[in-house]
C-alpha cells in the first residue's frame, strides 16, 4: 500500500504559534480537510535559526549591488541572511520524500512571490521578492508543487495543487519501488489524457519523448527529465476547452461500439 503523500508546510499555517507576533495563520482547508489524505511536515525557518517568539519583524532588503538580504525591520544592520541561507540549504536534505510544500504568503522567509523588498534606506520597494527559504526550496526542487496559503482559497489553484501532489507522490513511489521502462510507460498511459486536459502542446511534446524511452541507456536520467516535463505540464491549470477535447478523445475510443 502506498503511504500518504508528505507535504511540507510553514509552521504557522499548521497552527503553531511561531509568527513574529506570537500568533499563527492556521490554514483551515489544509488542517481540517486535506490532513485526512496527507501527512504534513511543519517547519518555521525563522525559529529554526534560533529566533524567539515573539521577535522583531524581518524584511528583505535589496542592496545597491542588487543582492537580497534578510534583516530586522528596526535595524537593517542586524543581518540574518547567512544563518537563513545556511539553514535552508541544510534542510533541503530532509525533503527528498516530500510531494509538495505550502508556504506562508508575504513572509520574508517563506513567501513564494510578491514579497515586499525594501531599499537600504528603509524605503518600501516593489513586491517582487521571494522568501529566502522558499527561494532555496524552488531552486533545489524545481519540479515540486509549491503554493502559498492565500492562493489555495482559489478553487482552481487548490485543485491543481492537490492534483500535482498526488501525481508526484505516485511517480516517486514508482521510482523507489519498481522503476522500469514498463512501469513508467504504464504510468504515462494512465496520465496522458490528464496531461491533455492541462496542455495540448505539452501532451504532443511528451509523445515523441515517451516513444524514445528505449533509446536512453540510463533510465534514472530519463526518469528525471520525464518528471520535470510531467510536473511542468501539470503546473498549468486544466481548462474547460481542454477538458472538452479530452472527452472528445474518449468518445473516439468508443465510437465503433456505440450506435448512432
Description of each model-found segment:
Residues 76-96:
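Glycine-rich anion/phosphate-binding loops
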Residues 31, 45-66:
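Short, surface-exposed acidic-centric catalytic microdomains
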Residues 14-22:
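Short N-terminal binding/cap micro-motifs at the start of the first secondary-structure element
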Residues 89-167:
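Internal, conserved structured core segments that host functional sites
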Residues 2-7:
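Extreme N-terminal starter segment of soluble prokaryotic enzymes
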Residues 23-41:
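Short catalytic helix/loop segments, enriched in acidic residues and glycine
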Residues 146-260:
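Acidic, Ser/Pro/Thr-rich low-complexity regulatory regions
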Residues 10-11, 44, 101-106:
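Short beta-strand segments
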